[in-house]
């Protein structure tokens, strides 16, 4: 099941890229998905993934949550320049952010998305599913972003779609590699929790906060509430 939903998540990247090359979409559409995803991901991490990590691995799980958080920080800010959603439409920014570098950074990011999905399914179908939903909500924005970057750098529409597809492949690799390491679940699950917190709190929320108005901010809380309601319905 993890592999199947990994394919669906990867398709989200590709679909986001196709949307960009077919027509111009308003930025608020992208931010709505990011806001929902940020709230939902934080709720998943703190109410499901971290408690389950502690149940399996004890108090030592918190160390691996921290390692997961800073592992993504290392890749995004040191090994590859950090890229902000929305910069892709500015030609001047493209002089400083080459498409290949952005693709590498987002590729690392999406690889860890796959790790999180697979680690969740190694624990239970419920946990894997809620993590998948959290990640899928920001798959479209990822595809939007990389396709826009490639187009803004002067490359063809075909290459823009291929770049979005490459992010999908990275997601699948994360799913498959983690699924082969079931014995390391006590480490993989808290690592995925740290990755989830990083993506939601450090990547998505700051971009949501750049958007003026109350609607986008409200969607963060809608994301949190949707998971809490789902938990209540499933566990009653």
Model-derived features: positions:
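Intrinsically disordered, metal-sensing/regulatory segments
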Residues: 1-236
């Amino acid at each position: 099941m993890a592999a199947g939903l990994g394919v669906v998540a990867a398709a989200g990247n590709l679909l986001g890229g196709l949307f960009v090359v077919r027509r111009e979409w308003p930025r608020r559409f992208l931010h709505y998905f990011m806001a929902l995803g940020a709230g939902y991901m934080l709720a998943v991490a703190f109410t499901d993934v971290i408690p389950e990590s502690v149940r399996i691995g004890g108090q030592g799980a918190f160390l691996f949550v921290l390692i997961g958080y800073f592992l993504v920080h290392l890749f995004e800010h040191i090994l590859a320049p950090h890229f902000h959603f929305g910069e892709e439409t500015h030609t001047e920014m493209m002089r400083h952010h080459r498409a290949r570098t952005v693709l590498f950074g987002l590729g690392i990011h999406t690889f860890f998305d796959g790790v999180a999905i697979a680690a969740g399914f190694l624990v239970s179908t419920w946990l894997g599913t809620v993590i998948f939903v959290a990640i899928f909500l920001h798959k479209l924005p990822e595809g939007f972003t990389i396709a826009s970057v490639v187009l803004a750098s002067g490359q063809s529409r075909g290459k823009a779609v291929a770049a979005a597809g490459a992010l999908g492949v990275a997601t699948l690799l994360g799913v498959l590699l983690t699924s082969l390491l079931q014995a390391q679940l006590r480490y993989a699950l808290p690592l995925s929790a740290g990755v989830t917190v990083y993506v939601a709190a450090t990547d998505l929320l700051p971009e949501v906060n750049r958007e003026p108005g109350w609607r986008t901010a409200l969607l963060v809380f809608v994301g949190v509430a949707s998971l809490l309601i789902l938990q209540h319905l499933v566990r009653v």
